[in-house]
Amino acid sequence: MKRILAINPGSTSTKIAVYNDEKAVLVKKIMHTREELAPFKDFMEQFEFRKQVVLKTLEEENIPFEFDAIVGRGGLGKPIEAGVYEVNQLMLDDVTKAVRRHACNLGCSLALTISKEFPGCRAFIADPGDVDELDDIARIGGLPEMPHEPIWHALNQRAVARRFAKEHNTRYEDLDLVCCHMGGGISLAAHRHGRAVDANNALDGDGPFTPERTGTLPAGDLVHLCFSGKYTQNEVMNIIKSHGGLAAHLGTNDMMEVERRMNEGDEKFKLYIDALAYQISKGIGGLSTFFCGKVDAIILTGGIAYFRYLVEEIKRRVGFIAPVYVYPGEDEMEALALNALAVLTGCREVKEYV
């Protein structure tokens, strides 16, 4: 039996899961209050705090301190291929100085440091958000100094794609898929035979708008906003990443509230949900052109995939391209654990971060 601890640091929470082989024995989301995080100027400063939270929780839950592997959510260091990577010092250095700051950058350092508490324990990351396998034609943008760089939900998209393949008695590596993860960020990717050959930057301004992100904006208007004198660089980035989309239009990023207001007959809320469904559908349609329309399946996943009206609108618009399959929610903890298990059992090769 292989014992695995998965760690997923988020902006205001740390999720942990303990697995015995494929069986979860603990899954816990530890919320962090604003007061707890206030002393830290940057996510990376939270390392020791998060580490102690993880160890304390394991102790409180009476989890034996015996693990074969610790697997962390990968950070936003430099672009890499999909897969499972052994954590090394170069990886820690890259995420520490990464331009894009996110709590997920703590995942590899937490995995490595905690693994040292247990003799023989290994430290991994799997399918981080900066997985970059773009085809050459997908990388080219309108300026040489601004090539397209994907930041997407690689972990969940690839896990759901593998699940779909298993359910249909085939291999992920034999399929052409368009996948869309719909949450606070919305990522779309074209998966050709196990590689995401095109994907958007779902973090800071590419693709559909989301509950809280602007998505793609008119470049000229954005330039005027930046030089209006009203905003600093950080304020503009916060608008793009945290205060755009439905939050800007409707005053809330709570999709349960949005769905309730729409169901109560609020036409404004319905209009913006229709617009969101349309933008997601445009993204799916655009990616289908990579395959010249010959797509095996379209997969919708993420927390917003529970929103029935939105999903049905997307299906109505893109169903002519390929069958649409819906896997609501996300299980990144299971995906992390199973990726680590695949390496420990010899089913998948671990990669070296270089």
Where are these regions (language model features)?
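Glycine-rich phosphate-binding loop plus the immediately following alpha-helix
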Residues: 106-113, 125, 140-176, 184-185, ...
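Adenine-nucleotide phosphate-binding core of ATP-dependent small-molecule kinases
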Residues: 238-293
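Glycine-rich phosphate-binding/hydrolytic loop that grips phosphoryl groups
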Residues: 305-306, 325-354
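Short glycine-rich, Thr/Ser-proximal phosphate-binding strand/loop in the N-terminal lobe
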Residues: 4-45
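Short beta-strand-loop/turn "lid" adjacent to the catalytic site in phosphate-handling enzymes
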Residues: 58-103, 122, 130-142
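Phosphate/pyrophosphate-binding loops at sites that engage ATP/ADP/AMP, CoA/4′-phosphopantetheine
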Residues: 54-69, 167-170, 284-296
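Glycine-rich phosphate-binding loops at beta-strand->alpha-helix junctions
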Residues: 295-314
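Short glycine-aspartate micro-motif
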Residues: 2-7, 67-71, 177-181
